[in-house]
């Protein structure tokens, strides 16, 4: 018997941004879906606009599971995770243990299919970078949504993430920012007017 999917089902119970006041809370499961959709889009943009031949499904699969180990660790807030180099190094060890525990739940005959999805060191670096970009984009979108709802709690995070995205070397990220992100500052009536 494997407890893998019983654990994965608990992704919806792990709240993100735990130290911040949220107008609307976000859980790891819904965040992972959004990251998967954005990672898929980044690959499509990259292939169609910038001549790459990447596999959108590989990026999507990696994105779905990118935070799965948080079922075991919880979502440690960024200021805590990166407080200093010692804490960051120790947390990476904790993450590695949690990733291995996730893989250990997979039946032996499927372990190789899941290894690169659960163990970040086994993930293809190209797709890992795409998922990291998508993850950053989604965190930025969360900040925009909170700001639009009048919550200034996310201002500092928004500025930090915006700077990260502006310095991102992937041209698909800039394209996504220019094409899709502005809509996140609009309300539903404004979005519907544009249809």
UniProtKB/Swiss-Prot annotation:
**Which SUPFAM superfamilies does the entry mention?**
HD-domain/PDEase-like
Task: Please indicate which superkingdom the organism of origin belongs to.
Answer: Bacteria
- Molecular function terms, GO-annotated: 5'-deoxynucleotidase activity; metal ion binding; nucleotide binding
Q: What is its EC number?
A: 3.1.3.89
**A Pfam family recorded for this sequence:** YfbR-like
The entry's keywords = Cytoplasm, Hydrolase, Metal-binding, Nucleotide-binding
Stored HAMAP family = 5DNU (MF_01100)
Family designation: Belongs to the 5DNU family.
- The protein, known as: 5'-deoxynucleotidase SO_2484
């Amino acid at each position: 018997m494997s407890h893998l999917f019983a654990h994965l089902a608990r992704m919806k119970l792990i709240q993100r941004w735990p130290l911040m006041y949220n107008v609307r809370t976000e859980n790891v499961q819904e965040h992972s879906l959004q990251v998967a959709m954005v990672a898929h889009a980044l690959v499509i943009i990259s292939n169609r606009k910038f001549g790459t031949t990447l596999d959108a499904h590989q990026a999507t699969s990696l994105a779905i599971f990118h935070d799965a180990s948080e079922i075991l660790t919880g979502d440690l807030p960024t200021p805590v995770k990166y407080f200093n180099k010692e804490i960051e190094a120790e947390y990476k060890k904790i993450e590695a243990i949690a990733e291995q525990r996730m893989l250990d739940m997979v039946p032996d005959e499927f372990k190789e299919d899941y290894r690169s999805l659960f163990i970040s060191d086994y993930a293809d670096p190209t797709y890992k970078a795409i998922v990291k970009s998508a993850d950053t984009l989604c965190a930025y979108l969360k900040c925009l949504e909170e700001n639009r709802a009048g919550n200034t709690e996310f201002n500092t995070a928004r500025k930090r993430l915006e700077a990260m995205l502006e310095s991102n070397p992937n041209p698909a990220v800039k394209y996504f920012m220019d094409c899709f992100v502005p809509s996140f500052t609009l309300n539903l009536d404004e979005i519907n007017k544009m249809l």
